[in-house]
Amino acid sequence: MKLFLGHGLKFFATALAILLLCESMYFYLGYYQDKVNGSEVYYALTKSKSQVNKKYRVLIIGDSVALQLYPATKDYDDIISLTCNAAISIAGFYFLMNNYFKTNPNFLPDEVIFLVNPFTLSNNLSVLSFHYFLKPFYNDEYYPEITPSLLDRIHEIPYYWLSQVPFVRSSSYCVNYSLDPPKWAWISPIANDYLRKSYELAESKNVKFKLIPSPIRLDRENEIMSAIQASINNKESDLLNLDIMQNYISMINFMDTSCFFDNIHFKTQDIPKAYLIQYDK
């Protein structure tokens, strides 16, 4: 009986060791990245760290609406796209931009465009952020670029530290939580901070930086314009006085509600083609 138990324990220990080894390889080799929810984030992240062999005219970074307009998986003649989703926030967009600039210092684009739905600018980390933002970005690599306001917001997410545990990070698991409702009308504190950082990074490299809106459902016109006006009245953001934001607001456009399958995303047949041509000046 003791011999049987001894063999059983050895088998269990060996099986556990093999399982842990496989899990470690699965995590550290990044095999999970194209299998979890939000794999588009890891695709954009990997692409942002990849060396290019030519100079692109435009680098596009944006949310899931931008992903519909300019998929990151597609090759373009003079455009490179790092579009993914809004859950990584403007902070995540900045991290992608910074990665690209550090990886390709000799092939910086002429222009960086953040192609962003106006509602995305309200994101100050959300209930999706544990999975979509913390897992890829809350680590030593990006910590030096995390502002105090972003760090404070991260610490409001319950069990935020769990996001870096390998078997959690390599899964689609997300802590179930809620966050305090926003106290701002439109531009969140995180969006404000990281739009400025993005603009300053581009300026330091003599690269143009532009913020361009994707179309909004016509039946949400009053909703977004009221939020913008309230933001202006409340002087919520110091960016509102800059040309970059004033131009962005003036470019906000609307499409028939029938063109959308949800609050922000286009039906496949109604996705605008070559959307940025109208802003190519």
Task: Report residues per predicted region.
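C-terminal regions of proteins
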Residues: 231-232, 237-281
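Secreted/periplasmic serine-hydrolase-like ester/acetyl group-modifying domain
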Residues: 116-118, 122-205, 276
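Active-site-proximal beta-strand/loop segments in catalytic clefts of secreted hydrolases
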Residues: 61-62, 82-84, 115-117, 212-216, ...
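Second-shell loop/turn segments in exported
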Residues: 81-85, 182-188, 210-218, 259-265
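Membrane/wall-proximal cationic-aromatic binding patches
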Residues: 25-85, 89-96
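Membrane-embedded segments
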Residues: 65-145
